[in-house]
């Protein structure tokens, strides 16, 4: 059964915003209570958060579809809907977020670093929030916006200070098991290690992590063997340790040629040219291994490598190797800027962006694109004529009508607002020609202006009663 996964495809869907409420206040003896519809709640975000306790992407391999909760709709009596709950997804330190095309969206390094994979939709305004001096009792509310949906790829690049690289069965797993408390699978056949193993090493006052990367073979940079699956795990390491087998039984191999092959694969993979290298000649506890190590050590040192003769079985040379690595890591940490937890958002919301474009397409449709027009369309209930009129007013104030006229649009031409796959298309009627039908001051409560016969009769009765009482008081028979 799979227990380690370092690459998954994830579908993240944020919550939709709740719809606003169109409601009129109802209370005894208050016939004109006014609008009291509450706003809809915000949809929940989908957030990736780095957690040090998480070491694999296995959970998302089994369950790749994740959705945050929706915001609740508003209600009467000025009650706003509850916001949707954010969906927080823990990921390992070193997770890289990519889009489907392979472009890097975020590199999540450091405990607490967050990435907003999908933003929840805004809640719609209720009619109480839409009321104004001219629109005293709106008979509509705004719809909640849909949350963002995005397909992303998560790749784990192990965050370790040291990477052990080498041929299969060179003794990397044995070496990490004696340098640290790691318990990797160890056997005498190639590709025993199928996933990176991490261990923690303490050398004096320096504590660092070491990674045992699965064995590399010729063609690894092109994906041969376990190749590209695990080469990315060495990208973040401060130092590379070439583990060379001095007791190999294969006649066509020797430690120097193994080193040259691994270096060529690292060169082809790219990005590791300036990384410090150390050579660990392993298995020198075997007599033939010690003899071969003595032969090739001068050649390796002449190339500029620091060479250590080690044996995982006999525990030879381990202290010297661990302290040498600690020195290199301490220098690297001193020059590396401190990484702090950050919050990464793919596309921040444009708060004051009033920009939009109008283009004439080949099919004769005038297409309007812009953050505000598209958002307003998503918020409009097209089954409500008053809401549609409110949208027309907003677009006119933004300058969309003027831009359509300048672009050559005439009454009856088709206008589309939004992208091709999700646009609202309608026949345009300029406000100048349609104004006679739209001058009713939308949202106005005509009950405030029109005479009410019942109230008038009540006032007349009160006046007659007052007159009768006055006449009675003035009457004096004596």
Curated annotation (Swiss-Prot):
Keywords: Cytoplasm, GTP-binding, Hydrolase, Magnesium, Metal-binding, Nucleotide-binding
SUPFAM superfamilies, A to Z: Obg GTP-binding protein C-terminal domain (SSF102741), Obg GTP-binding protein N-terminal domain (SSF82051), P-loop containing nucleoside triphosphate hydrolases (SSF52540)
PROSITE patterns in alphabetical order: G_OBG (PS51710), GTP1_OBG (PS00905), OBG (PS51883), OCT (PS51881)
Gene Ontology molecular function terms on file: GTP binding; GTPase activity; magnesium ion binding
Residues binding GTP, per UniProt: 166-173, 191-195, 212-215, 282-285, 311-313
Cellular component, GO, one term: cytoplasm
Binding residue positions for Mg(2+): 173, 193
Domain Obg: 2-159
Pfam families for the chain: DUF1967, GTP1_OBG, MMR_HSR1
Biased composition range(s): Basic and acidic residues: 439-468
Location of the OBG-type G domain: 160-330
Compartments in which it is found: Cytoplasm
Record family assignment: Belongs to the TRAFAC class OBG-HflX-like GTPase superfamily. OBG GTPase family.
Chain's role: Overexpression suppresses sporulation although cell growth rate was not reduced. Impaired differentiation was eliminated by addition of decoyinine, an inhibitor of GMP synthesis. Overexpression has no effect on streptomycin production.
Protein name (database record): GTPase Obg
Organism whose genome encodes this protein: Streptomyces griseus
Name of the encoding gene: obg
């Amino acid at each position: 059964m799979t227990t380690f996964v370092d690459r998954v495809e994830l579908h993240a869907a944020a919550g939709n915003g709740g719809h606003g409420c169109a409601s009129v206040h109802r209370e005894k003896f208050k016939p004109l209570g006014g609008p009291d519809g509450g706003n809809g709640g915000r949809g929940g975000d989908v957030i990736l958060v780095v957690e040090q306790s998480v070491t694999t992407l296995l959970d998302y391999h089994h369950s790749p579809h994740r959705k945050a909760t929706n915001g609740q709709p508003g209600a009467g009596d000025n009650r706003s809907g509850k916001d949707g709950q954010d969906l927080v997804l823990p990921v390992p330190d070193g997770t890289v977020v990519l889009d489907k095309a392979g472009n890097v969206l975020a590199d999540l390094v450091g405990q607490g670093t967050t990435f907003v994979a999908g933003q929840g939709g805004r809640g719609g305004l209720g009619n109480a929030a839409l009321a104004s001096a001219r629109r005293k009792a709106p008979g509509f509310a705004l719809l909640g916006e849909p949350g963002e949906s995005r397909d992303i790829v998560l790749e784990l690049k192990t965050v370790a200070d040291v990477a052990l690289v080498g041929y299969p069965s060179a003794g990397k797993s044995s070496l990490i098991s004696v340098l640290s408390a790691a318990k990797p699978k160890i056997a005498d056949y190639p590709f025993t290690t199928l996933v990176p193993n991490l261990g923690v090493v303490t050398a004096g006052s320096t504590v660092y992590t070491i990674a045992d990367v699965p064995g590399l073979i010729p063609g690894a940079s092109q994906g041969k063997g376990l190749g590209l699956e695990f080469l990315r795990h060495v990208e973040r390491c401060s130092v590379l340790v070439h583990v060379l087998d001095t007791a190999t039984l294969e006649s066509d191999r020797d430690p120097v040629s193994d080193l040259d092959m691994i270096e060529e694969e690292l060169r082809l993979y790219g990005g590791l040219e300036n990384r410090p290298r150390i050579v660990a000649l392993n298995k020198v506890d075997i007599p033939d291994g010690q003899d071969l190590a003595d032969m090739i050590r001068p050649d390796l040192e002449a190339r500029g490598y620091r060479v250590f003769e080690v044996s995982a079985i006999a525990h030879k040379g381990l202290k010297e190797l661990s302290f040498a690595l600690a020195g290199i890591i301490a220098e690297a940490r001193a020059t590396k800027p401190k990484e702090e937890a950050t919050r990464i958002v793919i596309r921040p919301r444009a708060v004051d962006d009033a920009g939009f474009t109008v283009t004439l397409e080949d099919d004769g449709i005038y297409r309007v694109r812009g953050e505000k027009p598209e958002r307003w369309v998503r918020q409009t209930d097209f089954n409500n004529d008053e809401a549609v009129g409110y949208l027309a007013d907003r677009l006119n104030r933004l300058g969309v009508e003027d831009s359509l006229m300048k672009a050559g649009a005439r009454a009856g031409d088709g206008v589309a607002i939004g992208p091709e796959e999700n646009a609202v298309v309608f026949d345009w009627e300029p406000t100048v020609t349609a104004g006679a039908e739209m001058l009713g001051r939308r949202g106005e409560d005509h009950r405030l202006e029109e005479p009410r016969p019942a109230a008038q009769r009540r006032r007349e009765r009160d006046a007659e009663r007052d007159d009768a009482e006055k006449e009675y008081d003035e009457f004096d028979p004596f």
